[in-house]
Amino acid sequence: MREYKRYWLALVAVMVVCFSILGYYGVEVYRNSPPVVNFTDENGKVVIDKESIYKGQEAWQSIGGMQVGSVWGHGAYQAPDWSADWLHKELVAFLEIKADEIYHLKYADLNAEQKANLKVLLKKEYRENSVKDDKFVLSADRLKAISQVASEYAALFGDDPKFKSLREAYAMKENTLPNASDRADLNNFFFWSAWATATNRPGSEATYTNNWPHEPLIDNVPTGENVFWSIASVVILLAGIGLLVWFSSFYGKKDDEKLEPISEDPLKKLNLTPSQKALKKYLFVTLALFAFQILIGGFTAHYTVEGQEFYGINLSAYIPYSLARTWHIQASIFWIATGFLAAGLFLAPIINGGKDPKFQKLGVDLLFYALLFLVVGSFVGEYLAIANIMPINLSFWLGHQGYEYIDLGRVWQIILFVGLVIWMLLLLRGFAGGFKNKGDKNLLAIFAMSAVAVGLFYGAGLFYGQRSPLPVMEYWRWWVVHLWVEGFFEVFATASLAFVFVSLGLVSKRFATFQTLASASLFMIGGIPGTFHHLYFAGTTTPIMAIGASFSALEVVPLVLLGAEAYEHYRLQFAQSWAKTLKWPLYCFIAVAFWNMLGAGVFGFLINPPISLFYIQGLNTTPVHAHAALFGVYGFLALGFVWLVATYLFKGQEFDENLMKVGFWGLNAGLMLMIVLSLLPIGIYQAFASLEQGMWYARSAELLQQSHLQNLRWLRMLGDTILIIGGICFFAQLLKFMFNKKA
């Protein structure tokens, strides 16, 4: 322990300080959320009450929420951002009403001076905050404007034939929300979300969403703080890179211990335990869900060009875009998590001296069947909610929460959390035997801690409720999406790989321990407070922006050395004479390093500075980062774990080189083509539109249905097809292992 004392102290200090920051400013998120108030007319009559806004939030959740457009920039990209769209339409309606009232002309027919006068009135009407006694007074003209937008939205979310082509452009099914009273509540929720984007915080010149979205009509432009912290984030990034290169050059640990030649793979000498043999079905489910996810992903992408049809067949009444996208995202979380679960459960008996703890196989089997129940149950619940079969009051619990990546109903979410805790306990039972052994146990300690973090921190997603304010929900949602996945999964992967490579005699334990402890500190110092970079415009204050921009810049710092990490993984296959049998798992880990650098590093920083995200939040630049980071990093990690475990579960069998080459390179090439041929150019085009005209236009059908953007979406099919072929080849390889007589 003494040898690693500085590293442990650094890790503990990082965790304490960073979680203190995250917790302290989390309290600020609660305190400073935009208020849900009663809206009255000038006579004091309540025209939009708080209860109807909350009911509207529930109705929005039940139809898929963030899977049907977005609110405050978070959600899907085909339909509009409803808060930006509502705001712009209401502003335009208000200007027309005032132009007619004052000048008896249409707004377009006014001269420059008249337009300027109306814009002064508009900004005063919308930016001033007059909340008093939990009430906000709406003028008669503003109520007329609200009524016009509400009528349009009610028709859009119903089945009015005049809006059919627009529903197709937005990839919305007919009668998205059939009940008229529910649509009225939904309108009130969308109005409130737009109101928060236009209304200044008390004592501030910025709105509740830090002036997002960009809307020139009321001077919703970046604040001075936005620009300052954007510049600061770049400076912090450069300083961090310089310090990292300096310290890694002068003080970085090198693996200078000479490895003892080993004639045979040490793990292949071990007899598989019953619990390890039971993991074959985990590998099957991992790749089966992966195959399903990429197929439904291609299906979902096709909706962006045909809206309600799949090559002329109208499937939107059965599997609409919102449901297909929900399943696509939910399946990705399930299969990646299952791959990680399998890796941990495989290593537990090895750590325990090559034997199962008591009833370990029973625990592994029960966990597997609970996983199947969870997947099927949550998918059915999401279908019933979006199909409007499940009552809205049950949807949050059994159907669809409406929040991206945590779409599954709360009951299913609790089952998933319980399953992760059971997995954690199964691992710790195996780790307990390892702690009884003599020798250096520092690597095992960090491995165990990462397993506990993976098991417990998903529970953060249970801390918000059905009616929680959106900023509060976003705070806890990103604890799961950012901190649980991007933080603790990363540490768990690093620790588990280090343990495997040490067990195989490919690296020294001392070097692996130093590297794992140092990596954990680097991941966490930026990753924990960096969670706030998702909340710049989610109804939070300037300190949240400052913390998020500063610390999330540090997340990119360790990624600059990933070229060296990729080389180290490549070199491992030559470390021992037999190590070439690990070629394909190692290639997957090389891919992880590449996509971590590009997807998390380059594409991640593209949307990281506040000034950048102000204009491109919710555009197609976001799925560029999401696909490259989630699949490119964590997907390939899970696939690497699958092939690593499969190497030992299917002893005596060899990889089919043709299947694996097509699979590996197909997945990488397909992902790259999807990004460079379609998502990235569309995102860049939208960014210019957002800069010049506003967020509403960048997300509008008017822009996205232009022929050249349609062609770019069709081009995505090339990358999608190659990626799907690669995924099917990987699945075929596993089936070949499983049904080979030698198995």
Residue ranges and their predicted role:
Residues 1-49:
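Post-cleavage N-terminal segment of exported redox proteins
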Residues 8-28, 60, 68, 203, ...:
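Hydrophobic cores of alpha-helical transmembrane segments in multi-pass integral membrane proteins
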Residues 31-227:
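Soluble extramembrane regions of membrane proteins in the secretory/endomembrane system
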Residues 41-44, 309-323, 615-618:
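Perimembrane loop-to-helix junctions flanking transmembrane segments
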Residues 91, 256-269, 442-445, 695-698:
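Juxtamembrane inter-helical linkers in multi-pass membrane proteins
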Residues 253-279, 355-358, 572-582:
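Membrane-interfacial, low-structure loops and terminal tails that flank and connect transmembrane helices
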